[in-house]
């Protein structure tokens, strides 16, 4: 006896991200592998090391939003100098080409003091980073949200969560998106998440790793489906490096690009 339409199980709609990855494997075989290998040949292999404690990483990432890394680093150093803490100094690990070169070894700021600072004082302290009038209240609101949820400003508890659980916890905080959360989790904990900034997005679209209309926010999840966990960190570092060094927004240096043979920006018919 046939089931009535009302009792038939509805077929699940195909996952568009998984469908894209399968299509990519079918129509452009080995594109992902060739991209990873080409980038590694140019920029090397990278093992994860913690750059900063997670709260410092979060605040630094907020400071970098719509600002040059060098300016954001000056603002972070100003926080350290103005609101010193008595915590032990940490050894700073500068990243291979993703920023952080302007930071020194040292203790994180006193986050209680940063949260409680008069707003105009905090604006003046982080002014070197740019957009201080917008970022100062955002920093305090973020610190307040963390403290009210956890009792202090530490984010070390995120290490006990899965990458997606930790990302969801962070993105529930007003003003924190997938990119900011993924930067923190990748650099502070080595979690296999891709933080899609403008460099990663540009390279990904030009090579054809993600759909032409995919947004940066959507691209985070394309990479989760596309890469193995042990590939994510190195791919992240090298994509950022490539976007900064060769695949510029204007006048990309095609003649020295390690991805040239497979880049649809160079040749729309590239295999």
What are these regions (language model features)?
Residues 1-15:
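Mixed-charge, low-complexity intrinsically disordered regions
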Residues 15-271:
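Catalytic cores of DNA base-excision repair glycosylases
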